[in-house]
A protein has these predicted regions:
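Proline-aspartate-enriched helix->loop->beta-strand connector
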Residues: 103-105
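Carbohydrate-associated surface elements
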Residues: 163, 184
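A short beta-strand/loop micro-motif in the catalytic core of glycosyltransferases
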Residues: 107, 153-162
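Short His-centered aromatic/hydrophobic patch
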Residues: 87-91, 109-115, 133
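Nucleotide-sugar donor-binding and catalytic loop/hinge architecture
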Residues: 1-2, 192-202
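A conserved mid-protein helix/loop that constitutes part of the nucleotide-sugar donor-binding site
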Residues: 17-25
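A conserved, positively charged/aromatic
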Residues: 83, 99, 129-155, 173
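N-terminal strand-loop element at the rim of the active site
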Residues: 6-14, 26-85, 164, 169-171
Length: 202
């Protein structure tokens, strides 16, 4: 069985979180035990899900003992920047140890991806790295430099829409890496439930 790890240290409940859950659940339901989805709990952000919503018993591994993201909202320009810096500082060494110890077959990066991109480029792990883009990223100077030197060392970049795909495909070093992969937000059971709902005419 191949291992698929998800990296998604979120600072507030955004659509990406639901996309990670549905992606992991889909793998567990439909891969016929070919893949094992595992979510990395970077700093307590997945504690609430693990305790209350993990109906399929997805495997969740703690990367650190920190609970700084557990039930807390770190939105806002300065707060988010400070927490990103803090996360990078406390997870740099644990992430290296984790990748050396567990040797994931696949590592899917969703949020705060700069650290795993950098670590992978420095140590050239054999893990297949997939960068998941949630929306069109803002290309500040730091991201431009980082991506230019790290994207070449990963296997795939996925975009959730054709629009984002077409925009990113214009960047030379992304052309051979970028693919479209729509978010698995709605599950088959939810579709069946919606089909039974009555539509009120107005």
């Amino acid at each position: 069985m191949k291992s698929v790890y998800y990296w998604c240290p979120y600072i507030s409940k955004v659509a990406t979180v639901r996309a990670v859950i549905k992606s992991a659940e889909s793998l567990k339901r439909y891969s016929k035990d070919s893949y094992e989805p595992i979510i990395l709990n970077v700093a307590g952000e997945w504690n609430d899900f693990k305790d209350k919503e993990n109906t399929l018993a997805l495997k969740i591994i703690n990367l650190t003992n920190s609970k700084i993201l557990d039930g807390k909202n770190w939105t806002g320009f300065w707060k988010s920047r400070l927490i990103y810096i803090y996360l990078i500082l406390i997870t740099f060494i644990p992430l290296i140890i984790f990748l050396k110890k567990y040797k994931p077959d696949f590592f899917i990066l969703h949020l705060v991806s700069s650290l795993p991109l950098l670590v992978n480029s420095l140590f050239k792990f054999k893990t297949k790295i997939i960068l998941r883009i949630s929306g069109m990223p803002k290309f500040n100077l730091f991201r431009k430099i980082l991506w230019k030197h790290t994207i070449i060392n990963i296997d795939l970049v996925t975009a959730p829409t054709l629009g984002t795909y077409n925009d990113l495909k214009k960047i030379d070093y992304l052309k051979s890496k970028i693919r479209v992969l729509f978010d698995p937000i709605i599950s088959p059971s939810e579709i069946q439930k919606k089909k039974k709902e009555k539509i009120n005419d107005s």
